[in-house]
UniProtKB/Swiss-Prot annotation:
Enzyme Commission identifier(s): 2.7.11.1
Active site, UniProt feature: D156
Modified residues (Phosphoserine): S442
Phenotype caused by lack of the gene: Prevents assimilation of glycerol and fails to induce expression of glycerol dehydrogenase gld1 on glycerol medium. Leads to diminished mating efficiency.
Organism: Schizosaccharomyces pombe (strain 972 / ATCC 24843) (Fission yeast)
PANTHER family named in the record: MAP/MICROTUBULE AFFINITY-REGULATING KINASE (PTHR24346), NON-SPECIFIC SERINE_THREONINE PROTEIN KINASE (PTHR24346:SF110)
Gene Ontology process terms (BP): CAMKK-AMPK signaling cascade; induction of conjugation with cellular fusion; negative regulation of cytoplasmic translation; negative regulation of TORC1 signaling; positive regulation of cell cycle switching, mitotic to meiotic cell cycle; positive regulation of transcription by RNA polymerase II; SREBP signaling pathway
Organism ancestry: Eukaryota, Fungi, Dikarya, Ascomycota, Taphrinomycotina
Protein name, entry field: SNF1-like protein kinase ssp2
Length: 576
């Protein structure tokens, strides 16, 4: 039975950026104005279904996320925050999140539908010409650059996650929820797809960052142009050895430009690997680069654009007065970040209208585009050292301020916090942390360009380092459990510390809010360790147990308490 010819969204309400539908707008066969056609797949937290708009017949994908399973996994607050952010991402080569609908049982993400996969296209074509492969590669790199600029790293790029629309344009998928929920502890349990994963990821030494996406893009480019994987073995340990050795065959039929670019991307040492910005300047990459994908100049606005403020309020559930007040604040906040994102989206949209490329003029829509009978001929074809103080215990070092600093969110993607580079969005907490050390050495001339570095580096014995970390946590007011030996032996994961920290300004009568963090100590090389801090979300602890069942989605959590704790922890480590 098809929904009646009425506005099924008329009685819906908005809560924290998600649309709440009345019961009459939900059934087994439709969700609001979308008629469910078939199930496309099933994951750990629900199904993905194909649906069409009942008026326009436009296809969309509905991703169902079970609220009960989210509550059991203690992930729902992070999911809500991530959804509200992802709704703002608009790029012609990233799958769009059109809307979020909540029902009593599920969170339903309405996302752009793209029916093809680059994987299937490669299988059918065997290998592509350089012009064809370069076109796909340009779209992938520009989309990845857009996400890195807005603090999102994919970390699981592979042809299966690179979808193709009817016009054979790339649409990068799985930037968000499915990966957040299924990956848990990324470095402990998974390395994404082994054939496309960088050596630092499969070895579990460091938290994955932008260099990982560059490696994966290099593998994808190789596969498109050569028709096979550079590293492949059915026996996983052998595959890991091949990836770590970084020895692969470069075919003679590739042009010198393509060979040079691939060799600079597929480099085992992430410090020596080419960056996205360097790829952007590569001559081979820039051949026939469409106008809408060319780098744009930053536009510094002196006032708040009312159109952007309105969109921001709708997407994040904030009042316009609150948004304007946040924008006027001298301190950085999530509203400013989201505003900058929407502002860039607007600039991209204006550029896209001037492009000669087909079908790039509607990618910023906040709802599925109207049905079009347009058919392209293409669819008919086969498809980052400041100081090194000597402490009584281990020696700690903080890396030079990189292009970005990292905040992880227990997922296949990670959210990054930008530095003050180009006067953009300087984080006060990071500045406070930097002021705790002697910055006189930070201005020394570096022999190497800025890179991505994560965590806090230290030298010494692992037990001494762990003791220093526990002491720093104690001085910071965090709570933790000290590991105790069982039958004279310590648990195997003693290098992982789980802790929580009460957020002072979130304290209310009968309720305390805690930020949960996880610290992991990695051995980068003999005698050299890296301490990584990961956010495990936030949780409200009630003084009245019966209130714990009230676990709704009304409180929107920010990442700033986690960042404050990170800055405090670094200061305590250096003041030890």
């Amino acid at each position: 039975m098809q929904p009646q010819e009425v506005d099924l969204m008329e009685n819906s309400t908005m809560r924290n950026g998600a649309r709440v539908l009345p019961p009459e707008a939900i059934s087994k066969r439709h969700i609001g104005p979308y008629i469910i056609r078939e199930t496309l797949g099933e994951g750990s937290f629900g199904k993905v279904k194909l649906a069409t708009h009942y008026k326009t017949q436009q296809k969309v994908a509905l991703k169902f996320i079970s609220r009960q399973l989210l509550k059991k996994s203690d992930m729902h607050m992070r999911v809500e925050r991530e959804i509200s952010y992802l709704k703002l991402l608009r790029h012609p080569h990233i799958i769009k999140l059109y809307d979020v609908i909540t029902t009593p049982t599920d969170i339903v993400m309405v996302i752009e539908y793209a029916g093809g996969e680059l994987f299937d296209y490669i299988v059918e074509k065997k290998r592509m010409t350089e012009d064809e492969g370069r076109r796909f590669f340009q779209q992938i790199i520009c989309a990845i650059e857009y996400c890195h600029r807005h603090k999102i790293v994919h970390r699981d790029l592979k042809p299966e996650n690179l979808l193709l629309d009817d016009n054979l344009n790339v649409k990068i998928a799985d930037f968000g929820l499915s990966n957040i929920m299924t990956d848990g502890n990324f470095l402990k349990t998974s390395c994404g797809s082994p054939n496309y994963a960088a050596p630092e990821v499969i070895n579990g030494k460091l938290y994955a960052g932008p260099e990982v996406d560059v490696w994966s893009c290099g593998i994808v480019l190789y596969v498109m142009l050569v028709g096979r994987l550079p590293f492949d073995d059915e026996f996983i340990p052998n595959l890991f050895k091949k990836v770590n050795s970084c020895v692969y065959v470069m075919p003679d039929f590739l042009s010198p430009g393509a060979q040079s670019l691939i060799r600079r991307m597929i480099v085992a040492d992430p410090m020596q690997r080419i960056t996205i910005q360097e790829i952007r300047r590569d001559p081979w990459f820039n051949v026939n680069l469409p106008d809408y994908l060319r780098p744009m100049e930053e536009v510094q606005g002196s006032y708040a654009d009312s159109r952007i403020v309105s969109k921001l309020g709708e997407a994040m559930g904030f009042s316009e007065d609150y948004i304007v007040e946040a924008l006027r604040s001298d301190e950085n906040n999530e509203v400013k970040e989201a505003y900058n994102l929407l502002h860039e989206n607007q600039v991209i949209q204006e550029k896209s209208h001037l492009s000669k490329s087909k079908r790039v003029d509607s990618f910023l829509s906040v709802s599925p585009p109207a049905f079009s009978e347009y058919t392209s001929e293409l669819q008919k074809k086969s498809k980052q050292e400041l100081i090194d103080p000597t402490l009584e215990g281990p020696r700690w070092t903080v890396s030079d301020p990189p292009t970005y600093a990292k905040q992880t969110i227990d997922s296949n993607i990670c959210v990054l916090v930008p530095t003050a580079e180009k006067n953009k969005l300087e984080m006060r907490t990071l500045a406070d942390a930097a002021s705790a050390v002697d910055t006189s050495q930070s201005t020394r001339k570096k022999s190497r360009r800025n890179k991505w570095h994560f965590g806090v580096r230290c030298r010494g014995d692992a037990p001494e380092i762990l003791l220093a970390v526990y002491r720093a946590l104690q001085r910071a007011g965090a709570q933790f459990t000290v590991p105790k030996p069982v039958n004279g032996k310590y648990r195997s994961d003693m290098y992982t510390i789980k802790s929580r920290w009460e957020i002072p300004h979130c304290k209310r009568e009968g309720k305390n809010t805690y930020a949960y963090i996880e610290l992991q100590l990695y051995e980068v090389m003999p005698g050299c360790f890296m301490l990584d801090v990961k956010s495990n979300g936030y949780k409200d602890i009630y003084s009245h147990p019966e209130r714990t069942a009230d676990h709704g989605m009304d409180d929107l959590k920010s990442s700033f308490p986690f960042l404050d704790l990170c800055a405090m922890l670094v200061c305590k480590l250096f003041s030890a």
